[in-house]
Every structure is written in structure tokens, then in C-alpha cells.
Amino acid sequence: MSEEQTTQVNIKKKEKWGVAHIYSSYNNTIIHITDLTGAETISRWSGGMVVKADRDEPSPYAAMIAARRAAEEAMEKGITGVHIKVRAPGGSKSKSPGPGAQAAIRALSRAGLRIGRVEDVTPIPHDGTRPKGGRRGRRV
């Protein structure tokens, strides 16, 4: 009695990782996917490239569409996972990321990219230039 035995061969795909640099300010959101060294650009999209109105550039909706398009472009080029670096304007400007940062991370995940590390790389001043607003600050 000889039964045909089917063996299932697990073919592991080689994972190729990249870095998604997400710059999110209160004026725009830029998603820039590079290789691990950061030297080779794989895909770059911004909120202003996907919406018409200037006021919509920093919105979570624009960030979501830009991230999805960047992810599709990266996956076409063979990227399977990304480490994420989130950046706000920083320095003497705002140190908190804009409204599009979280939406962009979720869109990258939903598009099918594996998410590795999520890191905040906002520049912090070590007593750099004087912030704008004058001696007594911005009075609201």
C-alpha cells in the first residue's frame, strides 16, 4: 500500500527592511522611505502631494493617503518591513509632532508593511538659538 504523501515546503521570503522617516508639523506631513542606511530614497510622499487645498496638508487624512502611496511604492520595490522615525520641527519650534504622524504610522501598518521600531528623532536644543516671542513670550 503506497499512499502519495504531499510534503509542504515552507519557502521563507527574504525580508527586506527600510526606514520610514515621518516628518509631521502643523503645516504638512512628509513620509520618506529609505534603505537602512538612509542614503537611498525608495519613496517620498507628502500631504501636499495628495490634497488640493493648502489647509488640508497637515490633516490625518492627507497623511494616511500619502503613507499608503509611499508603502505601495516601497512594496513594489521589495521592502517588506520598516522601522519608523517620527520627527517634529523641534529646535526652537514645536517639539510635538503634528496631527498626521499617528495616522501615517497606522496607514503604513494597514498597507501590509511590517513595523519594527518606532523612534522619536525630534531635535532637542542644548541651549541653541533664542526662541521667537520676545522677552515675555507670546501673550494670548
From Swiss-Prot:
Domain of life: Archaea
A GO-annotated cellular component: cytosolic small ribosomal subunit
InterPro entries reported for this sequence: Ribosomal_uS11, Ribosomal_uS11_archaeal, Ribosomal_uS11_CS, Ribosomal_uS11_sf
GO biological process: translation
GO molecular function, one term: rRNA binding
SUPFAM superfamilies linked to this entry: Translational machinery components
Keywords annotated in UniProt: Ribonucleoprotein, Ribosomal protein, RNA-binding, rRNA-binding
Start and end residues of each stretch annotated as Disordered: 116-140
Pfam families on file: Ribosomal_S11
Cited HAMAP family: Ribosomal_uS11
Subunit structure: Part of the 30S ribosomal subunit.
Family: Belongs to the universal ribosomal protein uS11 family.
Cited function: Located on the platform of the 30S subunit.
Protein name: Small ribosomal subunit protein uS11
Encoding gene per record: rps11
